[in-house]
Amino acid sequence: MERLRRIGIGLLVLLLLPALSGCLGSDGILGIPESNGIPGGLTLACLDSSKYTSMTVEIDYEAGYLPESTSTDMLKQRLESVCDKPDGINFQFTETDFSNDETWSANDVRDLGDEAKAVSPQSGSTLTWQILFPAGTYDDTSVLGVAVDASTVAIFKDSIDDAENIFRRPSAEKIENSVLIHEVGHLLGLVNLVYTSPADHEDSSHPGHSNNEDSVMYWAIESSSIANFFDNDLPTEFDSDDLNDLSGLADGSICLLYTSPSPR
């Protein structure tokens, strides 16, 4: 799966970083050959207000695939709780014809997302992250959502509907709530995507994910394995280790090891 390959490359780079002296600051760039960066590459742009004082979350959705209001309301709350944006966090919804209602690859998400983008992720004093809600499924149909670069996520509602078990517990709406927060958590760099946590909370078998099933960053959240939660109480919160990581990144006590170049 391409997403795991990309995360694997990112983690390999992080393993090599001790050879570099000190931490990279908010302007530090590594020569990773993706001009739109990697998930987590714009985490400080969200956590800090020195450059970007406001944030826009651009929701581009296929007709009939508008996200649940509970999902976007919850995402706004989670971002406001961790991101320093004194001029506010706004959501912009745009119905979009992606001309693809079948199978999506990570490159499709990047390329068609780029075509649909209203503005650059880093424009003036506003940081913009983009979330696609397309028709169709990811090329690995067990994947419910994917973060493909520093500012872009796709959520696959068709696969979410398929993941809802016959008892509707958890419901498709509850699954979407969790998957959306989970994927944006990857844009925030969780878990260990662009830093090394002082806490041992990364799942060794699922890099970039939490080993705590009460965290929204738990590894099963972004895949059809989520149906194994037989009640309707899916995690939608970052746990204390996740929040401590974000706080440490924000105050500089945790080194940020990679930040993105300016995306296209």
Model-derived regions: residue spans:
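Short, solvent-exposed loop/turn elements at domain surfaces
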Residues: 63-70, 139-142, 163-164, 225-229
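Bacterial N-terminal signal peptides
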Residues: 12-18
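The catalytic-center signature of Zn2+-dependent metalloproteases
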Residues: 167-245, 255
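Propeptide-to-catalytic entry region of secreted or membrane-anchored zinc metalloproteases
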Residues: 24-138
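Conserved small/polar residues in nucleotide/adenosyl-binding loops
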Residues: 258-264
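Active-site-proximal segment of zinc-dependent metalloprotease catalytic domains
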Residues: 121-195
